């Protein structure tokens, strides 16, 4: 990624500060006023330059349509917060940039072990242990997991959250809801990879 000019860095820092302070990015007019540009159009040109350098994403049709990308110039990921993973494309790494919906200002160290990413829960298969549809599941990225732990697993190209049980060449991914049967994986004919260990839950209504 190309380095930012001094002016572009000012614009970027202002965007980040506004999001940190208010939870929302600034409008073009606010950027122009804060940084002394003659017009909102001048601010727009700087935003386009930042988008070309893949520091931000411009969302069309919204006055505050600016999203900071995870990889952002000289700022470290931890400054942005924990990445929230949305839909995971088949065959792609779970932390691939295109999977990151946004990021949350939570301290990764509040979870043990620390959270490397958040995954939006889809469905009620784990509701009996308090993991509800729409919650944000805090996940520590690791393949070092034990039977009985709740893991994020990829079976072929599907990502799921279940309790792990291994028996020889068979793996059973158990739901925590009696309405759901275990997912059975035969390692002799199917692929399975562990994406991480569930380390906590953030109730979505608190954060959205």
Curated annotation (Swiss-Prot):
User: Catalytic residues?
Assistant: 125 (for autocatalytic cleavage activity), 162 (for autocatalytic cleavage activity)
Q: What InterPro entries does this protein map onto?
A: LexA, LexA-like, LexA/Signal_pep-like_sf, LexA_DNA-bd_dom, LexA_repressor, Peptidase_S24_LexA, Peptidase_S24_S26A/B/C, WH-like_DNA-bd_sf
Q: Where is this site: Cleavage?
A: 90-91
**DNA-binding region as annotated in the record:** 28-48
Q: Which Pfam families match?
A: LexA_DNA_bind, Peptidase_S24
Q: Which GO terms describe its molecular function?
A: DNA binding; serine-type endopeptidase activity
Q: Does the keyword Transcription regulation belong to this entry? A: yes
Top-level EC class, please? hydrolase
EC annotation from Swiss-Prot or TrEMBL: 3.4.21.88
State any GO BP term from the record: SOS response
Keywords of the record, alphabetical order, are: Autocatalytic cleavage, DNA damage, DNA repair, DNA replication, DNA-binding, Hydrolase, Repressor, SOS response, Transcription, Transcription regulation
Q: What job does the chain carry out?
A: Represses a number of genes involved in the response to DNA damage (SOS response), including recA and lexA. In the presence of single-stranded DNA, RecA interacts with LexA causing an autocatalytic cleavage which disrupts the DNA-binding part of LexA, leading to derepression of the SOS regulon and eventually DNA repair.
Which HAMAP family does the record cross-reference, listed alphabetically?
LexA
**Similarity section:** Belongs to the peptidase S24 family.
- Describe its assembly: Homodimer.
**Protein name in the entry:** LexA repressor
Q: Per the UniProt entry, what species is this protein from, by scientific name?
A: Aliivibrio fischeri (strain ATCC 700601 / ES114) (Vibrio fischeri)
């Amino acid at each position: 990624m190309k380095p930012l000019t001094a002016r572009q860095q000012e614009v970027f820092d202002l965007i980040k500060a506004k999001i940190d302070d208010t939870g929302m990015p600034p409008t073009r007019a606010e950027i122009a006023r804060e940084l002394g540009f003659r017009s909102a159009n001048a601010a727009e040109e700087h935003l386009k330059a930042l988008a070309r350098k893949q520091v931000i994403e411009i969302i069309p049709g919204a006055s505050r349509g600016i999203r900071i990308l995870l990889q952002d110039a000289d700022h470290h990921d931890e400054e942005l917060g924990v990445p929230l993973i949305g839909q995971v494309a088949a065959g792609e790494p779970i932390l691939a940039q295109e999977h990151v919906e946004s990021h949350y200002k939570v301290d990764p160290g509040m979870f043990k072990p620390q959270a490397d990413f958040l995954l939006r829960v889809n469905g009620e298969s784990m509701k009996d242990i308090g993991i509800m549809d729409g919650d944000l599941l805090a996940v520590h990225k690791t393949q070092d997991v034990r039977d009985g732990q709740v893991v994020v697993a990829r079976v072929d190209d599907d990502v799921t959250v279940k309790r792990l049980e291994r028996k020889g060449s068979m793996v059973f991914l158990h739901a925590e809801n009696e309405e759901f049967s275990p997912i059975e994986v035969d390692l002799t004919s199917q692929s399975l990879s562990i994406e991480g260990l569930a380390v906590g839950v953030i109730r979505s209504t608190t954060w959205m």
